[in-house]
A protein has these predicted regions:
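Generic structural signal for alpha-helix termini and adjacent loop/cap motifs
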Residues: 16, 36-37, 66
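Cytosolic ends of transmembrane helices, especially the final helix of ABC transmembrane type-1 domains
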Residues: 5-33
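ABC-type nucleotide-binding domain
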Residues: 49-220
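Short beta-strand segments of immunoglobulin-like
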Residues: 44-46
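Active-site phosphate-binding and catalytic loops of NTP-dependent enzymes
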Residues: 39-42
Length: 220
């Protein structure tokens, strides 16, 4: 009896300590987010429907914590290439070779340190970020699905889409046949962050979402 009475407050203290640790982790993440600088948009040109003629002209980039004097610290160094409209281009290289960084430069998640990136002959820094990103569809490696139905998660790419357009996007992403095997079809819930689906299924739903958006530029 005495041992039980002694252990109860200790267990409470352990639980409080665990909650405090979890709270500190969340608070630290909150501070990191609040410390981030707001994006300054120097672009003034509204991009309508871009054709997708992308040109990298002697582009170099390094992350902020890199040594500016060290050439080897550049993730991308003096890159020049052209991607024509309608073409599919694969970036191949080792991990950390700059493939993801190149993709992140196009929608201006980062700004190039040197050189220029243009789309349809216009420097992307002259385009407003909102209109530029409206023309770009990105399928991230870490797919995010919200706790809703498959239909709702696909429709997030275009909230005004019809059921027929949603089905067509799913067919293009090769996920329609699987969806039709489910008892509730497109109305099947995916769970929090898509927990009820496999990694490949989540990826295909994310691809269907981008197809529904029908962007001028698609980054996978």
């Amino acid at each position: 009896l005495f041992i039980t009475m002694f252990l109860k407050p200790i267990n409470r203290l352990v639980n409080i300590f665990e909650q405090l640790q979890n709270g500190m982790t969340g608070f630290q993440r909150f501070v990191e987010i609040m410390d981030q600088k707001d994006e300054t948009d120097t672009g003034t040109i509204e991009a309508d429907a871009l054709r997708g003629n992308i040109v990298f002209d002697h582009v170099s980039f390094r992350y902020e914590n890199s040594d500016a004097r060290d050439v080897e610290s550049k993730v991308i160094h003096d890159l020049s290439m052209r991607i024509e409209p309608g073409k599919t281009v694969a970036l191949v290289g080792p991990s950390g070779g700059g493939k993801t960084t190149i993709c992140n430069l196009i929608p201006r998640f980062y700004e190039a340190d040197e050189g220029t990136i243009s789309i349809d002959g216009v420097d992307i820094r002259d385009l407003t970020r909102e209109s530029l990103r409206r023309n770009i569809g990105i399928v991230a490696q870490d797919v995010f699905l919200f706790n809703g139905s498959i239909r709702e998660n696909i429709a997030y790419g275009n909230l005004d889409a019809t059921d027929e357009e949603i089905v067509e996007a799913a067919k293009k992403a090769h996920i329609h046949d699987y969806i039709m095997t489910l008892d509730h079809g497109y109305d099947t819930g995916v769970g929090e962050r898509g927990v009820k689906l496999s990694g490949g299924q989540k990826q295909r739903i994310s691809i269907a979402r981008v197809f529904l958006k029908n962007p001028s530029i698609l980054i996978l």
